[in-house]
UniProtKB/Swiss-Prot annotation:
Protein family membership: Belongs to the HCP family.
EC number: 1.7.99.1
Protein name: Hydroxylamine reductase
Record flagged with keyword Phosphoprotein: no
Main subcellular location: cytoplasm
Residues reported in the UniProt entry to bind hybrid [4Fe-2O-2S] cluster: 239, 263, 307, 394, 422, 447, 481, 483
Gene name in the database record: hcp
Native organism taxonomy: Bacteria, Pseudomonadati, Thermodesulfobacteriota, Desulfovibrionia, Desulfovibrionales
A GO BP entry: response to hydrogen peroxide
Length: 538
């Protein structure tokens, strides 16, 4: 195996024995093989488009799901990748039968082995290092593109589940993956393709924003309890709002309280979700703390989308996966039929007594923020608000992430902190007060709600008649996995400069690629909170 797609990759270089995330070598090889098979499907789709042959939308949906399944902390069950690999080949063959062009040797001629051991052996020779390329910088950009495409695939899949999709997004997934096996592009062409990845991710996030707000309403500022009520309980982690909605419907009147964990916290702001009286509050913090937090939870646990870690024996019997999530030995529930989860919750003790642990606020997505835009603009003009910080991104276990806690704590009282994604859990419960009734800490949502932050920035730039880079706004970002890569590429596509990124820089970027980002976008690693605040504010 070789994998270096996440921020915590071993020694900052790459995992080659077992994933820091817990991914076993066989699963890593199967994921690589799936990506290889998908590249062959992508080559067929690109050839079909060139001949005017329509690629079914269903193929795009499958492609997004399959790529998403290889994202960090999604699926650790080797058996789940076998049908995905075979389906990629079947769909490729179906397209190939409709076109005149002879597809190239390689991914488009791949024949899967007949058993699991054979597939693992094939995956061994079709990994990241086996993609044809002799130029280290172009290889770096190819890998960056693959990881960005995984991020797009995650958002496209979520949006499609709620009925929002754009064939152009799927077409880019094909275009990008097919390109990774070409050798005729120079460095400039690869930079352009990577930036196009950011452009398409913006569209994918727009679709997901439309999907979530169309189904559940625009988020509104909402107070969320951090404590619990006495009684039976189910904890929902991940990102999938549809799964949560179905669970809320199926548990209504059953005496079970529903709690969010991790990136599900912003769900409390959606009107069509918060209306359920048994949707009580938020439990725990970010994904990397689940071993301790899940072990102490006295009810059933449902994992939607990514962020699962190896379950401890103490709760393996009470954790359930759904959608693309998989862990060997954990019960997987399909098609929103959460009866087994509910039965388990009813059989478990639940919380013995009420406990008040304070509250936090969420729901400050673009509609909520723009509804008070006039007040915000007036406060800036009056000197009451000096600066905005977007302190956002992924959380993780690697040392150095306390930087973000300290940065927010030390941000001056005349500044506003916008946040989103699970990086917020480094400071989400800090009491920062307000400026003229505007809370100084505004939780804008999940990682995909970077779309909200971008829309707010663009609107503020319009109000002040300046560019986004001229706003009193600084982005201090943390990253962990591939959705964060896609979001970073979106910001670069938009020309956003002076981004601070941490806790460490991606291992897949060569020094020359990093130098390009510094020279053209002034992207920089975080240093210390004091030094960075001084550099930003003077």
């Amino acid at each position: 195996m070789f994998c270096y797609q996440c921020e915590q990759t071993a020694k900052g270089l790459g995992c080659d024995k077992i994933g820091v995330c817990g991914k076993q070598p066989d699963v890593s090889d199967l994921q690589d093989l799936l990506v290889y098979a998908l590249t062959g499907l992508a080559q067929a789709a690109v050839a079909a488009k060139a001949e005017g042959v329509a690629v079914p939308l269903e193929t795009g949906r499958y492609f997004a799901k399959a790529m998403f399944s290889t994202l960090t902390n999604v699926n650790f069950d080797a058996a789940d990748f076998v049908p995905l690999i075979n389906e990629a080949v079947a769909k490729r063959k179906a397209l190939a039968a409709l076109i005149k062009a002879q597809l190239p040797e390689g991914p488009a001629s791949y024949v899967p082995a007949l058993d699991l051991a054979g597939l693992i052996a094939q995956g061994h020779i079709h990994g990241l290092k086996d993609i044809p390329e002799t130029n280290d910088d172009i290889r770096s950009l190819k890998h960056t593109l693959i990881f960005g495409i995984k991020g797009i695939a995650a958002y496209a899949d979520h949006a499609a589940i709620l009925g929002q999709e754009d064939p152009a997004v799927y077409e880019f997934l094909y275009e990008g993956m097919a390109a990774t096996f070409t050798t005729d592009k120079d460095l400039g062409a690869w930079v352009a393709l990577v930036l196009k990845c950011g452009e398409v991710n913006l569209r994918a996030m727009e679709l997901l924003d439309a999907a979530n707000t169309g189904a559940y309403g625009h988020p509104v500022p909402t107070v969320v309890p951090l404590g619990h009520k006495a009684g039976k309980a189910i904890l929902v982690s991940g990102h999938d709002l549809k799964d949560l909605k179905q669970l809320l419907e199926q548990t209504a009147g059953k005496g079970i309280n529903i709690y969010t964990h991790g990136e599900m916290l912003p769900a409390h702001g959606y009107p069509e979700l918060k209306k359920y009286p048994h949707f009580h509050g938020h439990y725990g913090t970010a994904w990397q703390n689940q071993h301790k937090e899940f072990a102490a939870f006295p009810g059933a646990i449902l994992m939607t989308t990514n962020c699962i870690q190896k379950p401890a024996e103490s709760y393996l019997g009470s954790i359930f996966t759904t959608g693309l999530v998989g862990w060997p030995g954990a019960v997987h529930v399909k098609n929103g039929e959460f009866g087994p989860v509910i039965e388990k919750a009813l059989a478990m003790p639940g919380f013995a007594a009420d406990e008040d642990k304070g509250t936090v606020m969420t729901g400050f997505a673009r509609n909520a923020v723009m509804s008070v835009a006039g007040t915000v603009i007036d406060a800036v003009k009056a000197g009451k608000i000096r600066h905005f910080f977007l302190v956002a991104g992924c959380d993780g276990a690697k040392p150095g992430r306390n930087y973000y806690t300290e940065f927010v704590e030390k941000a001056p009282a005349d500044t506003i902190v916008l946040t989103l994604a699970c990086g917020k859990f480094r400071f989400f419960d800090k009491q920062l007060g307000d400026i003229g009734g505007i809370p100084r800490l505004l939780d804008m949502g999940q990682c995909n709600d970077a779309y909200s932050a971008i829309q707010v920035a663009v609107a503020l730039a319009g109000a002040f008649n300046c560019g986004v880079n001229d706003l009193p706004l600084s982005m201090v970002l943390s990253w962990y996995e591939q959705k964060a890569v896609a979001i970073l590429l979106t910001l670069l596509h938009l020309g956003v400069k002076n981004i601070r990124l941490g806790p460490s820089l991606p291992a897949f970027l060569t020094p020359n690629v990093l130098n390009f980002l510094v020279a053209n976008y002034d992207i920089k690693p975080i240093s210390t909170p004091d030094e960075d605040l001084k550099a930003i504010l003077g």
